[in-house]
């Protein structure tokens, strides 16, 4: 089973972030531009939260707020769940399922190495299972 590090090597180590004082609208523009669903919220180098499309839907749209006037700090999730890049992908999926989150911050030795989404995790698991199936088919057909 792949590790988070292997997923990041394929995906890239870029950490997309936003400042807590940015507007939600600015954060949404960045997410749309990058094709992602969440941003790390950094105050300087310090991780202070995570903001996602889900935060926007629940804390801005459903409450009638204006994304151009609401600040990221007002809707971000402060208790960020971080995992090591050495964690296996299946363990990562278990954490996401247990905690009901779709994004995790990857942090090693206090350094943020990226974000991983449930989509990244599912793709890695499917790729791993496909490889296993191909190996079994090869073995069964007598070529192994």
Which residues does each predicted region cover?
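A glycine-centered beta-loop-beta connector
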Residues: 31-34, 39-55, 96, 104-119
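Short, charge-rich amphipathic segments
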Residues: 22-33, 64-75, 110-111
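The conserved cystathionine-beta-synthase
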Residues: 17-35, 82-100, 107
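Charged, low-complexity, helix/coiled-coil-prone segments
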Residues: 1-3, 31-42, 74-84, 108
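A positional/architectural concept
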Residues: 3-48
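Tandem CBS (Bateman) regulatory domains
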Residues: 1-13, 52-81, 88-97, 117-144
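Short, flexible active-site loop motifs that bind/organize anionic cofactors or intermediates
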Residues: 14-17, 46-47, 62, 82, ...
């Amino acid at each position: 089973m792949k590790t988070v590090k292997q997923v990041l090597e394929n995906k890239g180590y870029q950490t997309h972030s936003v400042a807590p004082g940015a507007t939600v609208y600015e954060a949404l523009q960045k997410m749309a531009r990058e094709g992602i669903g969440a941003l790390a919220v950094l105050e300087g180098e310090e991780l202070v939260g995570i903001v996602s499309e889900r935060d926007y839907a629940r804390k801005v749209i459903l409450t009638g707020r204006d994304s151009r006037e609401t600040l990221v700090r007002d809707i971000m999730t402060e208790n960020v769940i971080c995992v090591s890049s050495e964690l296996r992908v299946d363990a990562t999926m278990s954490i996401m399922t247990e905690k009901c989150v779709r994004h995790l911050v990857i942090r090693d030795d206090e350094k943020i190495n990226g974000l991983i989404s449930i989509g990244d995790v599912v793709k890695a698991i499917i790729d791993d299972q496909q490889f296993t199936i191909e190996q079994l088919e090869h073995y069964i057909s007598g070529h192994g």
